[in-house]
């Protein structure tokens, strides 16, 4: 799981929860790998999880991370688009993309605030898009299963 905007409070919380469930978590930041790794180290120690820092400061580094990611989450601050359709078109393994940003412009282009598993036709694997206002609604499905 790659978390864009991962060094902020929402990204850190999502990362801790995912890592606690066994996910391979990368907290990404536009500030570079050193900063994101420092944040990951701090919370790894505090919550006994394993997260890694990742550099999302350039288009090249973003595209490189998307090559290996199954799950992508956008948690950057409101009003910043962190991933475009052009980015997502190159995410060959991505099956789920979630965006917690509900303020225009949305954080991940193509994912609307109310999307609940919307098939993103423009992605290689037709990834499921989950919008900010739908995220609270998936909790019961995660706990109970389909």
Where would I find each of the regions flagged by the language model?
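Glycine-rich phosphate/diphosphate-binding loop of Rossmann-like nucleotide-binding domains
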Residues: 1-71
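Glycine/Thr-rich phosphate-binding loops of Rossmann-like dinucleotide-binding domains
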Residues: 11, 81-83, 106-107
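Short amphipathic alpha-helical segments
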Residues: 15-16, 40, 84-88, 109-111
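Short, acidic/turn-prone active-site loops that include or flank metal/cofactor-
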Residues: 31-32, 101-104
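N-terminal Rossmann-like NAD(P) cofactor-binding module of classical short-chain dehydrogenase/reductase
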Residues: 70-74, 97-98
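Short glycine-/small-residue-rich Rossmann-like dinucleotide-binding loops
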Residues: 76-78, 101-102
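Rossmann-fold NAD(P) dinucleotide-binding segment
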Residues: 79-94
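Adenosine-phosphate binding glycine-rich loop
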Residues: 103-146
